[in-house]
């Protein structure tokens, strides 16, 4: 019961801030985060901008969704998604952590949910 409440609260926070992580951080941390993001963009030849554009195109299609499978634990993975401003293209229901159950189980759940005719 306590765990279910925790995950409901996490989902609520994720949904609230998926398009505005700066609102979660506060002004001082927001400015530092924006500066860090700008530095990462400069050092990676705008990798994040290009990735976000590609993922946005996919999520805008009516018959497509983005799914994320990670070996990071779920809560830190959600935090990373928000910090990279990817919350808008990855609904929380489509983020799977393989930490405890393994990648195979994650992909079985995805196939069970979306079917076998996926790319």
Curated annotation (Swiss-Prot):
Enzyme class, first EC level, given as a word: hydrolase
Q: Does the keyword Translocase apply?
A: no
Q: Name one GO cellular component term.
A: cytoplasm
The protein's annotated catalytic reaction(s) are: O-phospho-L-tyrosyl-[protein] + H2O = L-tyrosyl-[protein] + phosphate
Q: Which GO terms describe its biological process?
A: cell differentiation; chromatin organization; DNA repair; negative regulation of extrinsic apoptotic signaling pathway in absence of ligand; positive regulation of DNA repair
Q: Give yes or no: UniProt keyword Transmembrane helix.
A: no
What is the E.C. number?
3.1.3.48
Co-factor binding comment: Binds 1 Mg(2+) ion per subunit.
Compartment(s): Cytoplasm; Nucleus
Superkingdom is Eukaryota
* Protein's recorded name: Protein phosphatase EYA4
Q: Which organism is it from?
A: Takifugu rubripes (Japanese pufferfish)
Q: Gene symbol?
A: eya4
